[in-house]
Amino acid sequence: MRIIGIDPGLARVGYGIIEIKNDKKILLDCGVIETGKEKKEEDRLYEIFKDLNELISHWKPNLAAVEKFFFYRSSTTISVVQARGVIMMVLASKKINISEYSPAQIKLTIAGSGKASKKEVLDAVMYNLELNKPPKPDDSADALAIALTKLNEEGFN
């Protein structure tokens, strides 16, 4: 089984891909899809669409986990919602089962507290995936935490 965890954004979409093999969690890939701020918004959304399609075609995940978005009063809210829409569309077009989790759910599942710090979540990701060094950048570590949340729900603790 393969899962992709996604941390949505317009400037950076974090992703992490984990495979379960012989009851062991194996990190296959993680990183970010970055879109240049100098580009028009529609070009940035298309870049997310194109790059995510390529990732999914390459890794062929069975499941997807995406962080839920909560509305804040911010100038970036609409852009992030649009990027999230593109992400959901790509996953749906590939017939991948999508689960969504709030930041508090992710923290509670991964680190044991819905109010866990970024460092506590990162430490839990490193422990769960038996990593010697933290995944970089932070958006990819967040995406791995999201994927691990889904795996936990599926019974792979």
Curated annotation (Swiss-Prot):
GO terms for cellular component: cytoplasm; Holliday junction resolvase complex. Mg(2+) 2 binds at residue 67. Keywords: Cytoplasm, DNA damage, DNA recombination, DNA repair, DNA-binding, Endonuclease, Hydrolase, Magnesium, Metal-binding, Nuclease. GO terms for molecular function: crossover junction DNA endonuclease activity; DNA binding; magnesium ion binding. GO terms for biological process: DNA recombination; DNA repair. Mg(2+) 1 binds at residues 7, 139. Its main location: cytoplasm. Its cofactor is Mg(2+). Binds 2 Mg(2+) ion per subunit. Its EC number is 3.1.21.10. It comes from the Bacteria. InterPro entries: RNaseH-like_sf, RNaseH_sf, X-over_junc_endoDNase_Mg_BS, X-over_junc_endoDNase_RuvC. It is found in: Cytoplasm. It catalyses: Endonucleolytic cleavage at a junction such as a reciprocal single-stranded crossover between two homologous DNA duplexes (Holliday junction). The active site is at 7, 67, 139. The RuvA-RuvB-RuvC complex processes Holliday junction (HJ) DNA during genetic recombination and DNA repair. Endonuclease that resolves HJ intermediates. Cleaves cruciform DNA by making single-stranded nicks across the HJ at symmetrical positions within the homologous arms, yielding a 5'-phosphate and a 3'-hydroxyl group; requires a central core of homology in the junction. The consensus cleavage sequence is 5'-(A/T)TT(C/G)-3'. Cleavage occurs on the 3'-side of the TT dinucleotide at the point of strand exchange. Homodimer which binds Holliday junction (HJ) DNA. The HJ becomes 2-fold symmetrical on binding to RuvC with unstacked arms; it has a different conformation from HJ DNA in complex with RuvA. In the full resolvosome a probable DNA-RuvA(4)-RuvB(12)-RuvC(2) complex forms which resolves the HJ. Belongs to the RuvC family. This is Crossover junction endodeoxyribonuclease RuvC.
